[in-house]
Amino acid sequence: MGVFCRDLPLFLLSGRGMMTGKHKKGENDMDIQILQLIEGAKQARGLAVIIDVLRAFSLECYLTQRGAAELRPVRTLEEAFAWRQRDPSVLLVGERGGAKCEGFDYGNSPSTIPAEAVRGRRIIHSTSAGTQGLTQAVHADERITGSLVNAAAVAAYIRARNPETVSLVCMGNAGVREAPEDLLCAEYIRSLLLDRPLPDLEARTDALRLRGGRHFFDPDNQEVFPEADFWLCTKRDLFPFVLRATEDELGLRMEKVDLSDLCSAAAWGQAALRTEKVEV
C-alpha cells in the first residue's frame, strides 16, 4: 500500500506563477510534436517523451513504486541475458509479442509482479515497443518515459525544464502499428502543456476497452494479457514522478525524478498534493 498523487495541483500544470514565456504554442514557444513508432523515436529531438501505455512504461512506474533498486532498459534479448551472465541476481522482465520472454523471470505485466519480488532488485527490462523506442531516440537531448499513470507529472516536468522542442513519441504495438492509448496519452500531455482541456478524455479512455485494450478482455488471453493490467495501466495521474533515462558505462538507467525535486518550495509555493491511498 502506498500514498500517491491522484490530482496534481493546478500550479504544477498551468503557467500561472511560473516561468511561462515559452509554454504556449504560437507565442515564441515550445514546439510540441507528436511522433509515431520506431521511426518517430529515431526522429525525436529536444526533450523526448517515449510513450507506451500498454504496458512497458506503466509497468516501470509500478516497479519503481514497489521498490526496485534500479531499472535498466535494453533493446535486445541478448543484452538482457548478458546482464544475467555478469550479475546472476538481476531480474529479467519483458516480452515479445506480449508474452513473457523464454528465460525471463516475469513478463510485462504490472498485475503479476509482486512488490516482494522487485524490492531492492536490479531489473533488466526489454519489450517489443517501449524499450525499443527509448534506446533508439538517440538524437534527443533528453529522454523520459510517459504513460497515463504519470502523465500529469510528465507535463509538470516538461514545464520545469522548458525545452524549445518536445517530442511525444507514441510507440504503438511492437513499434510498427499505431495504438490509440499511446496517442491519447500524448494528446493529454499536450493538452496539459497548452492549458487546453482535452475533449472527451473520459469517453476516449473508456473506449480503449474496445480498441487498443480489447485483448485484455479476451478470456483466452488472460495468461498473457490479464484484465487487471488494463485497469492498472489506464489509471490517470497516479504517480507524482517521472522516469528519466541516463547513460553510464553500463548502458541506459532509469532515474526517478520526484516533482518535489524539480524546484524549491519558494519557487512553487507550499501547495500540497491531494492524495489518497491506492493499492499497487
Could you say what each language-model-derived stretch is?
Residues 10-29:
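Short, Lys/Arg-enriched N-terminal segments with co-localized hydrophobic residues
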Residues 32, 46-49, 70-71, 89-92, ...:
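Structural motif
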Residues 39-41, 48-62:
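Short acidic, Gly/Ser-rich segments with clustered Asp/Glu that frequently serve as metal-coordination loops
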Residues 57-78, 84-91, 96:
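A short alpha/beta connector and helix-capping loop motif
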Residues 87, 105-142, 156, 161, ...:
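Long, charged alpha-helical interface segments
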Residues 154, 164-178, 185-186:
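Hydrophobic, aromatic-enriched interface-forming segments
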